[in-house]
Amino acid sequence: MKAGATSMWASCCGLLNEVMGTGAVRGQQSGFAGGTGPFRFTPNSDFSAYPPASAEGPNIVCKACGLSFSVFRKKHVCCDCKKDFCSVCSVLQENLRRCSTCHLLQETAFQRPQLMRLKVKDLRQYLILRNIPIDTCREKEDLVDLVLCHHRLGSEDDLDTSSLNSSRSQTSSFFTHSFFSNYTAPSATASSFQGELMGGDRTLGSGALAQEPSEIASANTEDDEDDDDDDDDDDDDDEENLEDRTPGLTKKRVRASLSDLSSLEDVEGMSVRQLKEILARNFVNYSGCCEKWELVEKVNRLYKENEENQKSYGERLQLQDEEDDSLCRICMDAVIDCVLLECGHMVTCTKCGKRMSECPICRQYVVRAVHVFKS
C-alpha cells in the first residue's frame, strides 16, 4: 500500500513538470550555461550592464595648505612662481596675487642680511616652488646663495625681454614712419600740381600743408631716437650694476677662526657653518652634534680653554723671565749669590766669581768675590 502511494506521487510530479514546462526551461538554462542549446550565449568581457564609472579628474589643491578649492577658497595663481594657491594662502598687493612665501621674500628686497634672518623652511619652500634642486644645500647660507643666484638670473631674463621689446618697437616705428612718408608724398605732389593750375597763392598754401606732415614725421623720429638712447643707457646701467654685484660672489670667503671672538656673547650670533669651521680649525670633533646649541657649547668651552691657556702661558713666561734674571750670567745654571769687589756688581755665582779676573759689566779688576745670602 505504501509503495503504491509512492509511485503514484512520483508519476503525478512527472506529469506536473511536463505540463508546466519545467524541463524545457531547465534545458534552455543548461544550454545557456553550457553553450550547447539552441541559443548559444558567449559572455563579452567588454560589455557591462552598468555604465562605466566616470574618470575622476585631477584633484587640484592649494600648494600651501593642501586643501581643495571651493566657493569659499577660490583659486588664485601666484604671479611669481605660477602655482595655484587659495585666497587664504595668497596676498593681494598692487593688483597682483602672490603666495605667502613669495611675498615674504619679496619684502626682503633679496638682500643677504634680510634673507639670513628668514627661516630655512621658507627658503626651501621658495626654491621648491620654482623646481630648483636643493639636494646639495647643507647650510642656510647655501640656500641664500641659491636664492640670490636664481633672482639674478631672473633679472637678466627680464633685461633680455625688455631689450627684445625695445628692438621690436624700433622696427615697428621704422615701418610706421616709412609708411607715412610714402603715403604723404603723393598728396604733396597732387597738391603742388593743383597749386600750379589754380595760382601762386594756392601753391604757397599747398606747400605749407605738405611741409607740416613731414615736420611731424621728423619730430616723431627724433623723439623715438631719444627714447631708444634712454633705453640703451638704462641697459648699460643695469649691466654695470650686475657686473658690480658679481665680483662679490666670486670673492673667496674668509673662514671663521677663534681670534674673531671677543667675548662669549659673540658665539650666539654665529651661524652653524662658522661654528663648524672654528671647531674643525682647532681639531675638535663635532660629528655627534645635531643641534646648534651643542655646537655653541663646544665653541664656548673651546674659547674658555683658550683664554686659560693664554693666561697660564703668560704666567709661565713671566716666571721664566724672573728665573732668568736670578741666574748666573756666566754658567746660566746656578743662582746669583756673589758680589764682586771693588765694583759691587752681582752678576755671577760664587764659583764663577772666584774665577773671574775682571767684572764682565764694567771691566774693573776683581779684588775679591764675596758670597751673599738672601733673606
Curated annotation (Swiss-Prot):
Q: What organism is the protein native to?
A: Bos taurus (Bovine)
Any one GO cellular component localisation term in the record: plasma membrane
- Record-given protein name: E3 ubiquitin-protein ligase RNF34
Provide the positions where the record notes the PTM Phosphoserine: 169, 257, 259
Which portions of the chain have biased composition (kind: Acidic residues)?
221-242
Zinc-finger (RING-type) residue ranges come to 328-363
Location, primary (coarse class)? membrane
Mention one GO biological process in which this protein takes part, according to its record. nucleotide-binding domain, leucine rich repeat containing receptor signaling pathway
The protein's gene is named RNF34
Q: What is the documented function of this protein? A: E3 ubiquitin-protein ligase that regulates several biological processes through the ubiquitin-mediated proteasomal degradation of various target proteins. Ubiquitinates the caspases CASP8 and CASP10, promoting their proteasomal degradation, to negatively regulate cell death downstream of death domain receptors in the extrinsic pathway of apoptosis. May mediate 'Lys-48'-linked polyubiquitination of RIPK1 and its subsequent proteasomal degradation thereby indirectly regulating the tumor necrosis factor-mediated signaling pathway.
According to its UniProt record, the EC number is 2.3.2.27
Annotated membrane topology: Peripheral membrane protein
| Residues in SAP domain copies | 115-134, 267-281
